Amino acid sequence: VAEDITARKDELGFAAFTSAGMDSSSDWRFKTHLANLPIYFEYQADGIGSTDAIKGTYLDNYKNMFDLYINNSTCAPTELAGKTGDDSRNEFLNNEAVFYQNGSWEYTNLVGDGKPFTDDDLTMLPIYIGVGDEANQGLCTGTENYWCVNGTAKQEDIDATLAFMNWVITSDEGRKSMSQDMGFVAPFDTFTGEYQSANPFVQIAAQYPAEGKTPVSWNFATIPSEEWKNGVG
């Protein structure tokens, strides 16, 4: 599909992919999120959840996908070093490309407040790199963030923090703020009915496992270092 779009780019007036910029505001999408896919499938093949040394079993698959991005893009590969995250987003907003790699957190930058898209204009697709059971593959799903309480703080501060965290996920105001106003993924059993996220990307992510498809877990915590990621990038 991407290569067909490129072959007809002048006729269609748009490209397949937004620019895969290697500026620091953009490169995390590829040296972390896209790079997670070959790591995930390597772990799946080896039956592990972490390793002391990533073998790179599926690095060729990763390279093929990235080559698809940069050779079917809004710009020439030689221009990518200076392309930013804003450039990529704006290309998508201006209907210059069909595909834009990003996550559910990007929703509010694309819909509402004068943005050109409605919920019906957008969807999310798994990234298939030619490995595993693609017919039953879901979206890449995970988090790098956790709620923590400082165990060395005063007990009164610990209690107040825990009370606030409980309020956020149980009160009407807290739940509405998280799921509706901010559009966050809220993986708590208190977020049912009207408190389910209004973010359609979150709903799509939930739909895949409901249909029996397996999410691709985030394995970022096992990536050796930022230097390793920079080498990949």
Functional labels for PLM-detected ranges:
Residues 48-82:
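Glycine-centered hinge/linker elements that transmit conformational signals in sensory
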Residues 141, 190, 203-233:
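C-terminal capping/gating helix-and-loop segments adjacent to ligand/active sites or protein-protein/ligand interfaces
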Residues 85, 102-107, 143-145:
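Beta->alpha turn/N-cap motifs
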Residues 2-51, 97:
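Extracytoplasmic/periplasmic solute-binding protein
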Residues 74, 113-181:
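Extracytoplasmic/periplasmic substrate-recognition and gating elements
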Residues 2-5, 88-92, 106, 161, ...:
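Short, hydrophobic alpha-helical packing/hinge segments within bilobed ligand-binding/sensory domains
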Residues 79-94:
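Short helix-initiation/N-cap motifs at beta->coil->alpha
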Residues 98-102, 123:
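Paired acidic/hydrophobic, glycine-rich loop segments that form the ligand-binding mouth/hinge
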